[in-house]
């Protein structure tokens, strides 16, 4: 059984874009760009009992992070922004809200399309 949700994003701007949308307690962790296996394990070890989600950019860096997560945390669910927006931070909040809603996150009603 999971003890809460943990959402992993790339950077501070991604976190700031997503935080106001959520209507539940979610731990949001930042990789601060591309990281290695050791740093990833250090980041995620305290959250091993959480349900893991990733929300990385639709670019090469995001692809590398998704591949790293697949190898070491295959249970993590990957959320994806539309290639049109490319980055989480530039994706409109209402679009992010719909992606989060589909993944069973509770969101504030003002962001529902």
Give the predicted meaning of each segment.
Residues 11-12, 58:
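Helix N-cap/beta->alpha junction signal
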Residues 1-7:
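A short, flexible N-terminal coil/short beta segment enriched in small residues
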Residues 7-8, 54:
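Conserved SAM-binding loop
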């Amino acid at each position: 059984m999971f003890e809460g949700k943990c959402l992993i994003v790339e950077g501070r701007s991604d976190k700031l874009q997503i935080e106001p949308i959520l209507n539940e307690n979610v731990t949001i962790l930042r990789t601060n760009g591309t990281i290695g296996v050791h740093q990833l394990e250090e980041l995620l070890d305290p959250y091993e009992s959480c349900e893991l989600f990733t929300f990385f950019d639709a670019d090469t860096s995001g692809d590398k992070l998704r591949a790293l997560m697949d190898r070491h945390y295959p249970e993590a669910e990957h959320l994806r922004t539309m290639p049109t927006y490319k980055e989480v931070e530039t994706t409109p909040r209402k679009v992010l809200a719909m992606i989060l809603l589909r993944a069973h996150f509770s969101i504030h009603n003002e962001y529902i399309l």
